[in-house]
């Protein structure tokens, strides 16, 4: 069975068939400037095979590809927004560590507070950066 399928589907046949079926034939036929009749369609089929028409197709976008692009935008923006939640967790960790450090050694209050403010600023900056990237993905692309 495997040997039979190996003879029936050669790599070149699979490649040409998949290229042929990837775009509708109407896009190729409409690209030609001459008016097509039944005789010209039959001469078109005889003179140049469909595999040669595949190479003459230009880039086109469809509604499906635009929907896929929109979905990819939303997925990317959602993934970038996850960083904002990480920023909130980082801020909570910074101030939790401040409270624990102050409870262990109250004499270092000023130094601990300055480090906590620095940690808060860095966490908040990363959160704002993630939010900015999410908005760039949504509205600038």
Swiss-Prot record:
Disulfide bonds: none annotated. Keywords: CF(0), Hydrogen ion transport, Ion transport, Lipid-binding, Membrane, Methylation, Mitochondrion, Transit peptide, Transmembrane, Transmembrane helix, Transport. The chain crosses the membrane at residues 82-102, 117-137. It is a multi-pass membrane protein. Trimethylated by ATPSCKMT at Lys-109. Methylation is required for proper incorporation of the C subunit into the ATP synthase complex and mitochondrial respiration. It is found in: Mitochondrion membrane. Mitochondrial membrane ATP synthase (F(1)F(0) ATP synthase or Complex V) produces ATP from ADP in the presence of a proton gradient across the membrane which is generated by electron transport complexes of the respiratory chain. F-type ATPases consist of two structural domains, F(1) - containing the extramembraneous catalytic core and F(0) - containing the membrane proton channel, linked together by a central stalk and a peripheral stalk. During catalysis, ATP synthesis in the catalytic domain of F(1) is coupled via a rotary mechanism of the central stalk subunits to proton translocation. HAMAP family: ATP_synth_c_bact. This is ATP synthase F(0) complex subunit C2, mitochondrial. It comes from Homo sapiens.
